[in-house]
Curated annotation (Swiss-Prot):
<dbReference type="GO" id="GO:0008556">
    <property type="term" value="F:P-type potassium transmembrane transporter activity"/>
</dbReference>
<dbReference type="GO" id="GO:0016887">
    <property type="term" value="F:ATP hydrolysis activity"/>
</dbReference>
<comment type="subunit">
    <text>The system is composed of three essential subunits: KdpA, KdpB and KdpC.</text>
</comment>
<keyword id="KW-1003">Cell membrane</keyword>
<dbReference type="GO" id="GO:0005524">
    <property type="term" value="F:ATP binding"/>
</dbReference>
<keyword id="KW-0547">Nucleotide-binding</keyword>
<feature type="binding site">
    <location>
        <position position="522"/>
    </location>
    <ligand>
        <name>Mg(2+)</name>
    </ligand>
</feature>
<keyword id="KW-0812">Transmembrane</keyword>
<dbReference type="Pfam" id="PF00122">
    <property type="entry name" value="E1-E2_ATPase"/>
</dbReference>
<feature type="transmembrane region" description="Helical">
    <location>
        <begin position="219"/>
        <end position="239"/>
    </location>
</feature>
<feature type="binding site">
    <location>
        <position position="518"/>
    </location>
    <ligand>
        <name>Mg(2+)</name>
    </ligand>
</feature>
<dbReference type="InterPro" id="IPR023298">
    <property type="entry name" value="ATPase_P-typ_TM_dom_sf"/>
</dbReference>
<keyword id="KW-0597">Phosphoprotein</keyword>
<feature type="binding site">
    <location>
        <position position="395"/>
    </location>
    <ligand>
        <name>ATP</name>
    </ligand>
</feature>
<feature type="transmembrane region" description="Helical">
    <location>
        <begin position="662"/>
        <end position="682"/>
    </location>
</feature>
<feature type="active site" description="4-aspartylphosphate intermediate">
    <location>
        <position position="307"/>
    </location>
</feature>
<feature type="transmembrane region" description="Helical">
    <location>
        <begin position="34"/>
        <end position="54"/>
    </location>
</feature>
Amino acid sequence: MSRKQLALLEPALVRQALMDAVKKLSPRVQWHNPVMFIVWIGSVVTTALAVAMATGHLAGDAGFTGTISVWLWFTVLFANVAEALAEGRSKAQANSLKGINKTAFARKLREPKYGAQMDHVPADELRKGDVVLVEAGDIIPCDGEVIEGGASVDESAITGESAPVIRESGGDFASVTGGTRILSDWLVVQCSVNPGETFLDRMIAMVEGAQRRKTPNEIALTILLVALTIVFLLATATLWPFSAYGGTAVSVTVLVALLVCLIPTTIGGLLSAIGVAGMSRMLGANVIATSGRAVEAAGDVDVLLLDKTGTITLGNRQASEFLPAPGVDEKTLADAAQLSSLADETPEGRSIVILAKQRFNLRQRDVQSLQATFVPFTAQTRMSGINIQDRMIRKGSVDAIRRHIEANNGHFPPEVDRLVENVARQGATPLVVAEGATVLGVIALKDIVKGGIKERFAQLRKMGIKTVMITGDNRLTAAAIAAEAGVDDFLSEATPEAKLALIRQYQAEGRLVAMTGDGTNDAPALAQADVAVAMNSGTQAAKEAGNMVDLDSNPTKLIEVVHIGKQMLMTRGSLTTFSIANDVAKYFAIIPAAFAATYPQLNALNVMHLHSPASAILSAVIFNALIIVFLIPLALKGVSYKPLTAAAMLRRNLWIYGLGGLVVPFIGIKIIDMLLTVFGLV
């Protein structure tokens, strides 16, 4: 669930934006936008000319020049309003996070375990590595990792989701965020950051920090717009001697009006707002982007690496069956499987313990009473287990257990290979259990592919985006689930090194790669990916490696992130097309008005039959200013997104924004000319 969306033009935001827009009229702000800086200079020049004419220091029509000057100032002001509105929406979203309750004191434990002696200390004195106890009703004082316990946590202040979530030690749900509230039970949390460096602090600082850095595409487009502006500036400058040679020199006011109408002021005025709004839309989707560069990269992504669990499948794999090896009875397998899972905090491990209880009433056992040593799972060994006196029980992937058996001079039965293959062909995950050098059998873990995911992948394929499923399952299981889900490719038995190598392989082919991750073992791949979305419930290392954080911790959000990125790029491209196409109509309005007296043949270009030269020039300038206002909602909201191929999308946008950019100015300028004439304003 996304946090509450702000109304597109909320009155309070508009009022603040208008005040900020006036402040942005300062030349120190305007020179950052070269196109609008030219308009600002034109406004200053025409204002000075109007004052000089009004005071009799210069011959000319002070009323006409003053009116042109006013509308040029409006053009700059409207561009400022667009940017201020976009920034205001982002700041309003960040301000809602400032209101999150923070605790004044924390229970700092002297030892990292429940029941240890504690000291009550100010929360702002906690440092990275400190361990605190939080109980029902407490506000978590720092970002950190749960090292003991489990509790229901209200994260609505951050995610906007009213339903509480479970945070517990072990697994993928061990990360907690400062400012969230414990609803039940207790947690022992190890702080992962120092004061002022929390996730909320960094997020607010990002939104409210210094001026936003332009993205590479934005810089490239700015260079294009500046080049066009220079071309039109030189062209306009040559018109004065050209007209003077013809006998009637064009006034500076008309030349300034012509220049402002020809340069791409529409996209120049909205470009910054589009970028800020893109980050704001990400925040509206509960995704925090560390920079506009990350949002832009999301729009260019053409390979998605998707974790199977939680993204493609529901992610709640449960033990469904014990399949013993030849010569082993099912209860013996269940007994060993349960023992190997007693200290396993993962949902899969707990489901194995429960299944053994249900099938064979195996109860009342724990690691401490058995004087056993738990062997945790690692991405390198790909197995876990337990050592009980002279018994060594392991469970894990087929390859991991095979290596373990061979290392202990044992034999891996071919019958177990067939069991594994049958489980995998059904789309379930096989876990092999062994004791010492003997294979006891296979545990089947069932998962379910999410509804509608196949259709979403088909849409991505139509857009030219390749989907790759990443899973730790064996090749047969991965192939079965990949076929059911409709992904383009898969990486089975994935290790952190394999993920990293796959990303580098795609990047070497010139592709941009996006992925999600939540564990410390995902950090290298997240750091390498072009778009890396870390889960808020994930580890601190994963969050620091990624360039986005999903507050909802929903891996499927990666697809929405790509949609928002593409929408931002489409909006920028569409409004650029519209802005450049606009110039044609303005050309037909101003050129005849400015030069028909010198060259009557140019009257043939007055296809709109505008009332007079003055009304034609003024109509074009007014339209040039007002079109920015009408396009502000589109810049903030983004153009309509449809999952089409690049060629189809280009054709669609050329028809809508290219043809629209040609037709709308002809209609708009003509209507403004008629209104000016009817009301006798020219």
